């Protein structure tokens, strides 16, 4: 993201949509996926519709309410905290860019194109990044990855063969606990069956002794 801004500044003195697209194409040629090191991918996140992600303001408020102390700390807390810091700083720079364009670009049509591109395209990428790392810190990385896979399977399944409602991230930990609890009774079932099968034999032997 920071490289994107640097390239944009070098490309021309007046940032345009064409310059940003050229820059992004160069970055894509490097095959950089910000989710790879966390076990996910851009493709996996793309299964979630754009309106699934909260607004950037809501995500920033959530990050501040839950993790502000850790984000402002000079200590390294986790890779997710580091990624959150970078995403928040990057969005701040994008807002500065949009403000600069609004003040310095004379052509209204070009100005609208740049601001719209930043808000829609780059805004969605930042929303995805913020949501992913906040969710990993809140629910755990494995739970989030399980959710992404579950949602991807659900959305690609024809409506006639899938549940009416999509998976919900906050319910996955509860489902996991239920599964763990469900295994234990199966292990205990053999012993009561043996006791039940042995009890009639004892009764028969006792009745025979009494008859004798």
UniProtKB/Swiss-Prot annotation:
Instruction: State any GO BP term from the record.
Output: viral penetration into host nucleus
The protein's UniProt keywords, in alphabetical order, are: Disulfide bond, Host nucleus, Host-virus interaction, Repeat, Secreted, Signal, Viral immunoevasion
| InterPro entries in UniProt | Hepatitis_B_virus_capsid_N (IPR013195), Hepatitis_core (IPR002006), Viral_capsid_core_dom_sf_HBV (IPR036459)
Where do the record's region annotations for Disordered lie? 165-212
Q: Where in the cell is it found?
A: Secreted; Host nucleus
Map out region (3 X 8 AA repeats of S-P-R-R-R-R-S-Q) in residue numbers.
184-206
Highest taxon of the lineage: Viruses
In this chain, composition skew of type Basic residues spans: 178-205
sequence repeat coordinates: 184-190, 191-198, 199-206
According to the UniProt record, where is the region HBEAG?
Answer: 25-27
Looking up SUPFAM superfamilies in the UniProt record yields: Hepatitis B viral capsid (hbcag)
Q: Name one GO molecular function term.
A: DNA binding
Q: Which residues are marked as site: Cleavage?
A: 183-184
Cellular component per GO?
A: extracellular region; host cell; host cell cytoplasm; host cell nucleus; T=4 icosahedral viral capsid
**Propeptide residues, per UniProt?**
184-212
Q: What is its main location?
A: secreted
Which Pfam families does this UniProt record tie to the protein?
Hep_core_N, Hepatitis_core
Specify the signal sequence span. Answer: 1-19
| PTM entry text | Phosphorylated.
State the protein's purpose. May regulate immune response to the intracellular capsid in acting as a T-cell tolerogen, by having an immunoregulatory effect which prevents destruction of infected cells by cytotoxic T-cells. This immune regulation may predispose to chronicity during perinatal infections and prevent severe liver injury during adult infections.
Q: What do we know about how this protein assembles, alone or with others? A: Homodimerizes.
Database matches in HAMAP family: HBV_HBEAG (MF_04076)
Entry's family note: Belongs to the orthohepadnavirus precore antigen family.
Under which name does UniProt file this protein? External core antigen
